[in-house]
Curated annotation (Swiss-Prot):
It is found in: Secreted. InterPro entries: Scorpion_toxin-like_sf. Keywords: Disulfide bond, Ion channel impairing toxin, Neurotoxin, Potassium channel impairing toxin, Secreted, Toxin. The keyword Disulfide bond applies. Disulfide bonds join 2-15, 5-20, 9-22. This is Potassium channel toxin alpha-KTx 13.1. One of its GO terms (cellular component) is extracellular region. GO terms for molecular function: potassium channel inhibitor activity; toxin activity.
Amino acid sequence: ACGSCRKKCKGSGKCINGRCKCY
């Protein structure tokens, strides 16, 4: 699920403890 962080965050995001964090 972490691999889709970039798409969900539109390019800016990190995966922490299995969760997506957008910046």
